From Swiss-Prot:
Name recorded for this polypeptide: Signal recognition particle receptor FtsY
GTP-binding among keywords: yes
UniProt EC number: 3.6.5.4
Subcellular localization(s) per the UniProt record: Cell membrane; Cytoplasm
Species name: Buchnera aphidicola subsp. Schizaphis graminum (strain Sg)
Binding positions (GTP): 156-163, 238-242, 302-305
Record-linked Pfam families: SRP54 (PF00448), SRP54_N (PF02881)
Assigned protein family: Belongs to the GTP-binding SRP family. FtsY subfamily.
SMART domains membership: AAA, SRP54, SRP54_N
Purpose of the protein: Involved in targeting and insertion of nascent membrane proteins into the cytoplasmic membrane. Acts as a receptor for the complex formed by the signal recognition particle (SRP) and the ribosome-nascent chain (RNC). Interaction with SRP-RNC leads to the transfer of the RNC complex to the Sec translocase for insertion into the membrane, the hydrolysis of GTP by both Ffh and FtsY, and the dissociation of the SRP-FtsY complex into the individual components.
Membrane topology label: Peripheral membrane protein
A GO BP annotation: SRP-dependent cotranslational protein targeting to membrane
This protein's encoding gene: ftsY
Length: 351
């Protein structure tokens, strides 16, 4: 073999080796990505399982009172008038409410008759389907739009956990990379102002406040003005707890909305009512009065982990069709979770 041929041969060999090395390297990269993908999916699956376990535990009182009772009724071998009467009684006792219970039972009887269903198990899953459809209509997570600032006005009666919810929301949005500002418009309660100021200091979140007894609308105005000038992403305004039947207090909220609109016509972008699930059917009248006064755009239902009255969520969803943004199932920030109708149904039904 002459010199030129020898060089040509070795060049060809080197070229093949390089190609093989590149191919092997590419395959290794693809294999690594595939493994990482599987690992990521497994992590996501594990997180979902952990979350559902936490949710089921938190809703255990509602499940015991509603889900277990419903399940026992369906052990009956006969679908008749007595069966539906017992089912109706159980739903009423579970705080689902007269209007919503009547609707569900009527639809269930109609569907069971039309489909000639005599099997309790099939009727059970039909009930589950009907109740899921009620919640699914209000499963609309809050999306922070490009409005700067995105203004959230938080309202509710005393003791529902408004300021605590404001704190959790602020932490959530900050962790999501948003710049956040708080407004302490609960000027009737010095402790409420102080609570927000402490939160702001700990989490490096600016808090706009005035002295106790100041006009809440003035605080809201200052906060929106400041948030605009500082180009804040999310402004959350905490308000004083007010009874839904005190019309002059609801007028104050209307005034706050008007004042906010003077600076930003599209704001507030979210008017969020905080509801304590422990109040059961009393929350219906609260929601009605607040909605009538200031046109609510979202609900947060708190303290679901401490009550058997979680059935009220069906009544709220069915009667008002106001999006349920979050539910509270514990004390931690992570226990304020985006509402998911499918997860909720899975957690309160036995099967």
């Amino acid at each position: 073999m002459n010199f030129d041929k020898k060089n040509s041969f070795f060049s060809w060999i080197n070229s093949k080796i390089k190609k093989n090395n590149k191919k092997e390297k590419k395959e290794n990269i693809l294999l690594k990505k595939e493994k990482e993908g599987i690992h990521t999916i497994q992590n996501i699956d594990n997180k979902k399982i952990d979350f559902l376990f936490k949710l089921k535990n938190s809703l255990n009182k509602t499940k015991q009172f509603f889900g277990d009772s419903i399940s026992r009724i369906f052990l009956s071998k006969k679908i008749d008038d007595a069966f539906f009467e017992e089912l109706e009684d159980t739903m009423l006792l579970s705080d689902i409410g007269v209007h919503t219970t009547d609707q569900i039972i009527s639809k269930l009887i109609n569907d069971a008759t039309h489909k000639e269903l005599k099997n309790p198990e099939k009727v059970y899953f039909l009930l589950k389907e009907h109740m899921y459809s009620i919640l699914n209509r209000v499963e609309k997570p809050l999306k922070i739009s490009n409005h700067t600032p995105f203004v959230i006005l938080v309202v509710g009666i005393n003791g529902t956990g408004k300021t605590t919810t404001v704190s959790k929301l602020a932490k959530k949005y900050k962790l999501a990379g948003k710049s956040v500002m708080l407004a302490a418009a609960d000027t009737f309660r010095a402790a409420g102002i102080e609570q927000l100021q402490i939160l702001g200091k700990r989490n490096n979140i600016p808090v706009i406040s005035q002295s106790s007894g100041s006009d809440p609308a003035s605080v809201a105005f200052d906060a929106v003005k400041s948030a605009i000038s500082k180009k804040i992403d999310v402004l959350i305004i905490d308000t004083a707890g007010r009874l839904h039947n005190k019309l002059h207090l609801l007028e104050e909220l209307k005034k706050m909305v008007r004042v906010i609109k003077k600076l930003n016509l599209s704001a507030p972008h979210e008017i969020m009512l905080i509801i304590d699930a422990c109040n059961g059917q009393n929350t219906i009248k609260q929601t009605e009065m607040f909605h009538k006064a200031i046109n609510l755009t979202g609900l947060v239902i708190t303290k679901l982990d401490g009550t058997a009255k979680g059935g009220v969520i069906f009544s709220l969803a069915n009667q008002f069709l106001i999006p349920i943004r979050y539910i509270g199932i514990g004390e931690k920030t992570t226990d304020l979770v985006v509402f998911n109708s499918n997860d909720f149904i899975k957690s309160i039904f036995v099967k």
